[in-house]
């Protein structure tokens, strides 16, 4: 059995997937990782195959690249990011039996898994990534977000967050899905996070606040 583990981020995003990969290897699985090129030499030294994706994170860690761009340049970068993901993850996933994606920039992996007819699992490292009436969505300053008041209506904020996901990524993702013969995505955030994500966080330090409103929250498995 072969598993593809994919993330786009810095060391804190990559290392948990590497730990998962080592455990899967110990169980006899073949593991392949899609990660930024910075980590290739280290991970290959652990006996796992690496397919580089995205830019080196060292070059983007000091300044948020989107914060310094015009809206048109932001759109071009977003389109390029999605196109690169569909190409890279699409090639890396060939011959794999499952895709595990971590961090919310997994914009192509769910479509690639659907196209190949294999399972896809999204993993969050912190409860705040996942919709819940008990906390606010992540604050993205480059998008113009500001921290909400302590007693804000979190459900309304999550509803707006879903609208923002659709506005930012919907048409870009749907264009690539159409090329694969897949239907458009109605809810981009749910498409990325899935309805049954894993929460890889210590249940004491980062517990999932159950019970919750099933109409607005996914069914979370805390690992």
How should each PLM-predicted stretch be described?
Residues 82-151, 204-206:
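Conserved nucleotide-sugar donor-interacting segment of glycosyltransferase catalytic cores
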Residues 46-47, 116-118, 193, 216-218:
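Short, structured coil segments at secondary-structure junctions
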Residues 34, 160-223:
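A nucleotide-sugar donor-handling region in carbohydrate enzymes
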Residues 49-98, 147-156, 173:
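Phosphate/nucleotide-donor binding subsite
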């Amino acid at each position: 059995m072969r598993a593809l583990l994919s993330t786009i981020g810095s060391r804190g995003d990559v290392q948990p997937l590497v730990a998962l990969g080592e455990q899967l290897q110990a169980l006899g699985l073949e593991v392949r990782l899609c990660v930024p090129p910075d980590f290739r030499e280290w991970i290959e030294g652990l006996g796992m195959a690496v397919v580089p994706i995205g830019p080196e994170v060292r070059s983007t860690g000091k300044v948020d690249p989107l914060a310094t761009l015009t809206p048109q340049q932001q759109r071009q970068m977003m389109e390029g990011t999605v196109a690169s993901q569909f190409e890279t993850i699409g090639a890396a996933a060939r011959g794999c039996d499952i895709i595990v994606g971590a961090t919310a920039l997994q914009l192509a992996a769910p479509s690639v898994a659907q196209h190949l007819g294999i399972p896809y699992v999204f993993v969050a490292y912190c409860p705040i990534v996942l919709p819940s009436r008990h906390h606010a969505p992540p604050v993205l300053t480059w998008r113009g977000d500001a921290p909400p008041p302590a007693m804000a209506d979190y459900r309304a904020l999550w509803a707006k967050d879903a609208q923002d996901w659709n506005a930012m990524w919907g048409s870009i993702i749907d264009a690539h899905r159409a090329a694969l013969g897949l239907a458009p995505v109605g809810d981009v955030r749910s498409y990325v996070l899935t309805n049954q994500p894993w929460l890889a966080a210590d249940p004491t330090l980062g517990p999932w606040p159950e019970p919750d409103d099933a109409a607005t929250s996914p069914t979370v498995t805390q690992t």
